[in-house]
């Protein structure tokens, strides 16, 4: 997430500038009963599969390991809590994908643990079940992201927007955002011609701060900036 200053989900907020218009364990043989119970739970967790995949699913992290012995998983979030990773802490249902396999599972509880997030998922009753989920990418619905403050934006909502300057000159589309530690930077791509006369993809980097970013119109899918085409 980025603040037009500040994360696949960051958010952004522009820093105000004076006069700026825009605000911005070991092997153990398990009892048959437990094995059957785990199988039933796993089947239930797969009940909601690709058919129920939400149209606004956003990838927010990946399951990298099991955590503890009680079925918790460890997730490497694509953004820190407070920068889009907080969606993993607030949403009650996750969608998981690995290769062509897709499934949905309730997130019973989650919390920050060091530089990762750990969570207890429905149908994942022990460490073996949690280990089986390693490598799955985690998605949540965009509509379930935490609400932002005024003039704050999730990066996922900015990618793909057209960028034009105040003179109406088209500068390209937002391809990505970069966090340089001090602020967010729009990485804009546009069609260009290389020195050999062949088509290439040009790049512009515009700091996402109020002195340059004047308007973010998500309805019109457009960002207006104070930036010249030859900068």
Curated annotation (Swiss-Prot):
Q: Name one GO molecular function term.
A: ribosome binding
On whether rRNA processing is a keyword of this UniProt record, the answer is: yes
Give the chief site where it resides: cytoplasm
Q: Which GO terms describe its biological process?
A: ribosomal small subunit biogenesis; rRNA processing
Q: List the disulfide bonds.
A: none
Q: Which Pfam families match?
A: PRC_RimM, RimM
Residue span of the signal peptide, if any?
Answer: none
Q: How does it assemble?
A: Binds ribosomal protein uS19.
Its biological purpose is as follows: An accessory protein needed during the final step in the assembly of 30S ribosomal subunit, possibly for assembly of the head region. Essential for efficient processing of 16S rRNA. May be needed both before and after RbfA during the maturation of 16S rRNA. It has affinity for free ribosomal 30S subunits but not for 70S ribosomes.
UniProt remark on domains: The PRC barrel domain binds ribosomal protein uS19.
Q: What is this protein called?
A: Ribosome maturation factor RimM
Give the organism the record lists. Answer: Paraburkholderia phymatum (strain DSM 17167 / CIP 108236 / LMG 21445 / STM815) (Burkholderia phymatum)
Q: Which gene encodes it?
A: rimM
């Amino acid at each position: 997430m980025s603040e037009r200053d500040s994360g696949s989900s960051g958010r952004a907020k522009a820093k105000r500038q004076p006069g700026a218009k825009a605000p911005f364990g070991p092997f153990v043989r398990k009892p048959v009963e437990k094995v059957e119970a785990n199988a039933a739970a796993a089947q239930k967790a797969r009940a909601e599969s690709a058919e129920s995949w939400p149209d606004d699913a956003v990838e927010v992290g990946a399951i990298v390991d099991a955590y503890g012995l009680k079925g918790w998983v460890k997730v490497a979030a694509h953004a820190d809590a407070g920068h889009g990773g907080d969606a993993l802490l607030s949403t009650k249902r996750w969608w998981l994908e690995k290769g062509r396999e897709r499934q949905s599972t309730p997130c019973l509880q989650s919390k920050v643990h060091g530089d990762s997030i750990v969570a207890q998922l429905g149908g994942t009753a022990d460490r073996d079940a949690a280990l089986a989920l390693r490598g799955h990418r985690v998605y949540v619905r965009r509509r379930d992201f935490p609400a932002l403050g005024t003039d704050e934006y999730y990066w996922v909502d900015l990618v793909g927007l057209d960028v034009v300057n105040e003179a109406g000159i088209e500068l390209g589309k937002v391809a990505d955002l970069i966090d340089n530690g001090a602020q967010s930077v729009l990485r804009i791509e546009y069609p260009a011609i290389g020195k050999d006369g062949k088509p290439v993809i040009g790049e512009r980097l515009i700091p996402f701060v109020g002195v340059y970013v004047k308007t973010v119109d998500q309805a019109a899918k457009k960002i207006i900036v104070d930036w010249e085409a030859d900068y």
